[in-house]
Amino acid sequence: MIQTESMLDVADNSGARRVQCIKVLGGSHRRYASVGDIIKVTVKEAIPRGRVKKGDVMNAVVVRTKFGIRRPDGSVIRFDDNAAVLLNNNKAPIATRIFGPVTRELRTEQFMKIISLAPEVL
């Protein structure tokens, strides 16, 4: 469960290391985001020669949460960190590599590029 002010790791090679959620998209009073939801983030920590720099505001999709997600068969998948992948204005990832596992819940038409770049899909 990601909410406003939550800090997330970045699971791609866009150049950002840490981002902070500034808005959960999808409704005027929506409070929480889970895996597969799009949020508005600001870059808090970045590497020197990356595609993004500190202070940039962009969209991101949540790919891992500590809270976890429940599957229809009753199983729960939790991760050790909260992580997101940065998106451009067309909702496509700006990075060319994804680090760490992602979940099958991202397998919608919108995020198939992330699934194909990920090293492991749980």
Swiss-Prot record:
Q: Which GO terms describe its molecular function?
A: large ribosomal subunit rRNA binding; structural constituent of ribosome
- Enumerate the InterPro entries for this protein: Ribosomal_uL14, Ribosomal_uL14_bac-type, Ribosomal_uL14_CS, Ribosomal_uL14_sf
Keyword list (alphabetical) reads:
Ribonucleoprotein, Ribosomal protein, RNA-binding, rRNA-binding
UniProt-listed GO biological process terms: translation
| Keyword set includes Ribosomal protein | yes
Please indicate which superkingdom the organism of origin belongs to.
Bacteria
Q: Which GO terms describe its cellular component?
A: cytosolic large ribosomal subunit
Q: Which CDD domains match?
A: Ribosomal_uL14 (cd00337)
Q: Which HAMAP family match?
A: Ribosomal_uL14
Which family, according to the similarity comment?
Answer: Belongs to the universal ribosomal protein uL14 family.
This chain's function reads: Binds to 23S rRNA. Forms part of two intersubunit bridges in the 70S ribosome.
Q: Which PANTHER family match?
A: 50S/60S RIBOSOMAL PROTEIN L14/L23 (PTHR11761), LARGE RIBOSOMAL SUBUNIT PROTEIN UL14M (PTHR11761:SF3)
Quaternary structure? Part of the 50S ribosomal subunit. Forms a cluster with proteins L3 and L19. In the 70S ribosome, L14 and L19 interact and together make contacts with the 16S rRNA in bridges B5 and B8.
Stated name of the protein: Large ribosomal subunit protein uL14
The species is: Acinetobacter baylyi (strain ATCC 33305 / BD413 / ADP1)
- By which gene is this protein encoded? rplN
